Amino acid sequence: MKFGKIFKKQMVPEWVEAYVDYNGLKRVLKEIRSYKHSKLTRAASRVSQQAEALHRSFSGLSFHPRHSERAGDIEDQVIKVDTVQEEGSRKLYETKFLKKSEEGGEFEESFFKKLDENLNKVNKFYRDKVKEVIEEAALLDKQMDALIALRVKMQKPDVDNLNLEKHPSDKVVVDTSDNTMRTQGTANTDMVHGIERTNIPEEEASHIMADIVPVSHTNGDEEEASIGDKQDLREILERVKMNDVLESPITTLKGVFGDSNEPISKKGLKKGEEQLRLVFSEFYQKLRRLKEYSFMNLLAFSKIMKKYEKIASRNASRNYMKIVDNSLIGSSDEVNRLLERVEVTFVKHFSSGNRREGMKCLRPKVKRERHRVTFFSGFFSGCSIALVIAVVFKIESRKIMEKNYGTEYMANIIPLYSLFGFIILHMLMYSANIYFWKRYRVNYTFIFGFKQGTELGDREVFLVSTGLAVLAFVCFLLNLQLDMDWRMKHHKTLPEVIPLCLATIVLFILFCPFNIIYRSSRFFFIRSLFHCICAPLYEVTLPDFFLGDHLTSQIQAIRSFELFICYYGLGEYLQRQNKCHSHGVYNAFYFVVAVIPYWLRFLQCIRRLCEEKESVHGYNALKYMLTIIAVIVRTAYELKKGRTWMILALVSSGVATGMNTFWDIVIDWGLLRKHSKNPYLRDKLLVPHKSVYFAAMVVNVILRVAWMQLVLEFNLKSLHKIAVTSIISCLEIIRRGIWSFFRLENEHLNNVGKYRAFKSVPHPFHYYDDDDVDKDD
């Protein structure tokens, strides 16, 4: 694999703009090569024209560049790199190309100008990130002081006077100038040059580099100073307060109606330890990514300079790489030292000194694709197609629809099985979304907050959906077979129980506590669903409101679940007739069920409005309130009919549809920006074909309008009406799948613009500094 592809693959998606523009530099080199090639072609033709005249004096003369034989002697005269000092001890590099007067020199000058821009950009980004992690390390020092003090207090409650000594490696000097961050040991650049000499494949080299953490060396003075740092236990405990890192409805209500401060218990300390483990793990991943960022950029500079030497026939690589080696990204050793400190601290305090167990937590294994997943996905999809054909043939061969009871029979069982059809279609759309997110490098695992190594890929989701499809079609086929079998005429209620058994199996798999069938993903879904149901008592995160939006597209599935409760709970299956609409309670819940998803999203928006104080959440809440009104009026029309209800349903649905469509395209997708680089789209697009975005907007409008068709009076039979309702519900699920891709694309681009590549894990302890005390006074 070429380095350009490996370089792109190894990038942190949210930091793409901060990397060396390797492809841009290659384009400049192509211009230089094209010019050199045309120059050599002209020179060769000139030589051939003079061949006869020169033949009598010089036999076999060939063209040679004038100064090529002495290129090695004038290497130092090709470029001159100056350092410009800026405020805050920051350095900028400026390269002067000394051969500008030569023919084609302006191309090479533009190459070095672009190279300097990339070097300065990379150094600036690296400097800012190193400053950020050093400050974060200082905060983690205070968190560890608090944890150790609380552990001692819990083990020995009577001890008040105890000095906590810090490990020599815990000393951190928060000085982010270029001079202090640069050390004598240039481990990264030495490693890069070693890889260049040994010809190790770049992809393998990047993994080697990420796994090696050089041992930092601390001078004697620094070590002596840090050993002398001692803190009193009582002083620390007086400054520490436990944060509510694991929010629950109880803690939320306590925060609203009273003081949530409570004495720290052993249970609370245990939760704090678990939270601090997550903080250290996330911090370690950030350090590793920063180390990989440094290494890959150094490798990119080395590769591009080798290409320049080959194309321009100039030996400028050594001089320029010396500058790169001495720059911040090539010489700073702060990240390596922090990596070592985190490993030592984590192993000592969170793994009982067991380094192997500690490193397993800090470096979770990368998830590998399994061939059996692909095999069973194909197997189940093939079985699903075969079962669909079998169902169609069964209905046709028994001529069910031509019999008197056939229509009524299908009208009874189709709503029951449609629940599973909606779920399967939704999962298939989610599988397609994951495939395209991965293809266009949308970091969906970070956006959703999935734990590394446990996230489901597109093939796993496809496997689950096709497996459920096989199960549903087998049950449906079995239902048909038993109903039509003359031997079962005395046990007519037995086939009616099959949909209930299928629903029980699905619920058992979903809530199964054993570590089978992707337990971590199932529990993540259950937790997000519970947060949605308990809105606004939980802090609203992206997975929560994303799931809430998807629930609004599953109104018909929720109503099918309500039908399950009525059909089996009230004993309707014993009469083999669906008369649930004759029950007043069912009709009341028929209203409520349609409103619940929108109401939950409304409450989530109100919670975010109160916390973030941003007006956009207020407008979003208004949008859901209008949708709630439209759904209520439409449901009332569906039950009561009448021209007045029809007009009210059309007006309310039209207003809600218009606002929802505008919100989808402009707010959620970030499109229709009139003055953007891409007219009527947005500045940054991940999909290279602009027509895809315009097509998606048109399809979204059409499918948004489709649900209004339910308001119109078609005078359809019961079965046909069920079919139309199911088709429109399927179209809404497809629309939601399309919406999901562009919604996460826009979220990813927002993260890219802010270089936000890691989730912020809340610290378990709040440590009061002297500055905080002064502010309180």
From Swiss-Prot:
Disulfide-bond pairs as recorded: none
Location(s) in or outside the cell: Cell membrane
Source organism superkingdom: Eukaryota
Domain SPX, chain residue ranges per copy: 1-322
Cellular compartments per GO CC: plasma membrane
Pfam families: EXS, SPX
Ranges facing Cytoplasmic side: 1-372, 430-459, 518-646, 713-777
Membrane topology: Multi-pass membrane protein
Tissue localization of expression: Expressed in root epidermis and cortex, leaf blades and hydathodes, stems and flowers.
Domain EXS stretches: 581-775
Principal location listed in the UniProt entry: membrane
GO biological process: phosphate ion transport
Residues spanning the membrane: 373-393, 409-429, 460-480, 497-517, 647-667, 692-712
Induction cue: By wounding, dehydration, salt and cold treatments, osmotic shock and infection by P.syringae pv. tomato in leaves. Induced by salt treatment in roots. Induced by auxin, cytokinin, abscisic acid (ABA) and 12-oxo-phytodienoic acid (OPDA), but not by jasmonic acid (JA). Induced by Pi deficiency in roots and leaves. Down-regulated by sucrose.
Keyword tags: Cell membrane, Membrane, Phosphate transport, Transmembrane, Transmembrane helix, Transport
Extracellular side: 394-408, 481-496, 668-691
Function: May transport inorganic phosphate (Pi).
UniProt family annotation: Belongs to the SYG1 (TC 2.A.94) family.
PANTHER family in the cross-refs: PHOSPHATE TRANSPORTER PHO1 HOMOLOG 10, XENOTROPIC AND POLYTROPIC RETROVIRUS RECEPTOR 1-RELATED
Name of the protein described by the UniProt record: Phosphate transporter PHO1 homolog 10
Originating gene: PHO1-H10
